[in-house]
Amino acid sequence: MSYSIETYDKAQSILDRRKEKATLEAQDRADELCAKIPELNTINRKLAQIGLNISKTFFTSQNPKEDIDRLRTESLALQEEKKNLLKKNGYGENALAIKYTCPACEDTGFINGRRCKCFINLLKDIEREKIEKIAPLEECTFETFNTEYYPNNAENGEISPRRRAEKIKENCIRYATNFSKNSKSLFFMGGTGLGKTHLSLAIANVAINKGYSVIYGTAQNILGDLQNENFGRLDNLKYRENEILDVDLLILDDLGTEFKNAYTVSCLYNIINTRIGAKLPTIISTNYTIKELLDFYDQRITSRITGEYSLLTLEGNDIRYIKK
């Protein structure tokens, strides 16, 4: 999964802090117990000396295997003596052990060269946190997408807005369940407050849980940041071009609300075209109709969307207004 360098660095930093904290706490416990049980100091000195002797044995002994086996036997006996001493004084035999947040990998993030589950879960949490800073990701699930808010009346032989919403929800659940880096791109259309963002974020929730990297943002914010990056204005950027082009799933919300100029149009086309070429899925939402898109952008952008994306149109009344 192609997480950003920032996400990897943040996860590794958390692991490093966990390990450092566990090590310091273990040292504090050791100092406290050694002060209460002086015999522990004697055992620790003997164990340290055995460690040095084992190292020397490789270079000085005529029978290194025999001597190392003997030293290891002495070490095991001392370790057993230490456990018994702790028990005798009312402590568990592992009272001096380092208590890692993740005992499986000892807070390194890796087991036999492969990512530990704790590292994977950290990456997921960081992806989720980034989106939750700007959008209600936790609230937007398929379970909370209520189609009862859509009108149930059908006109001119068409299906009702409610039935349409139910079908789109079913399609989105299926899409999210089977999501991969090769999934098709989606294009949500419909008026304000009809659930386009909700469904996009519901898919994001599932994709993140499956271990995929996700970037969510409005067209205005993403294209604005990319324009600033292009002109060297690098302070406070949330989005960078290489991450936008490479992320497993890009969600571009509210297309058409951005400040339009020659650069943003060119940048938008590059995002759409590059990700189509790389077979990476993108979810775009807009309040515009296809005709309005043609008027606002050019034929190149609209034709790439209509030709390569699955079009999903929600109808009805502004749900946010109804909920009030």
Positions of the model-derived regions?
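Loop/turn-to-beta-strand initiation segments
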Residues: 184, 212-213, 246-249, 278-284
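Short glycine-rich substrate-engagement loop in P-loop NTPases that contacts/grips substrate
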Residues: 154-166, 208-246, 262
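Short, charge/polar-rich alpha-helical segments
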Residues: 1-44
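Walker A/P-loop nucleotide-binding motif
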Residues: 182-199
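Interdomain "pre-motor" coupling segment immediately N-terminal to P-loop NTPase/helicase cores
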Residues: 87-140
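Conserved alpha-helical scaffold flanking the Walker A/P-loop in AAA+ ATPase domains
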Residues: 174-178, 225-250, 266-274, 300
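Pre-Walker A (pre-P-loop) alpha-helix and adjacent loop at the N terminus of AAA/AAA+ ATPase modules
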Residues: 136-186
